[in-house]
Amino acid sequence: MQTVSSYGVELRKQNIPVRQTLEIYRSAVSYLTEIYEQVWEELAEIPDAKRRFNAAEHLVHTTKKNPARFDFDLRFPKMPSYLRRAAIQHALGSVSSYEIRMELWEKSGKKAGKPRLAYENHAMPVFYRDVMYREEKEGKDEAYLKLYDGHDWKWFCVHLNHTDMEYLRKNWSGKRHQPRHWRKGTINISCVFLIRKK
């Protein structure tokens, strides 16, 4: 039997654009939340979650076959697609939760405790393996994160503690799951992995 666990790896203090990346991601989530609140009636008519997500993405992302209704791509140029999709999912979840809470509040007849949709958020970006996060060669205590430097999305090398990397190398079974990033006050990469059966 295999157990799924996670392990937080603290990054050493480094000169990488962590704050800029966090700020642009949270701005994107706030902008999308505002858009999806405006068009919620339209989105709520789509019962299938995957189809609703696709419709939400088509509203903000222009392709050859789809001109977007809103200017997300102009406001957040070159945002990696996986990060854009994570922001869309977060915003959809926030608006959906708000709408459900509002409906329940209205049915209750209470005057106090009216739900509020927060545009300022504490969303944390997800770094998907290979497109937003990749490891250095075996034996090196480094990884690469795709971060926003204020102008463009670039790969930045992050140095990890040797003991953390040894633990991860020992316990990762080869099937690595998506790493997440950031916690208030410190920077962490939490990598979910399957613990090898002894």
What label would you give each PLM region?
Residues M1-K198:
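Nucleic-acid substrate recognition interfaces
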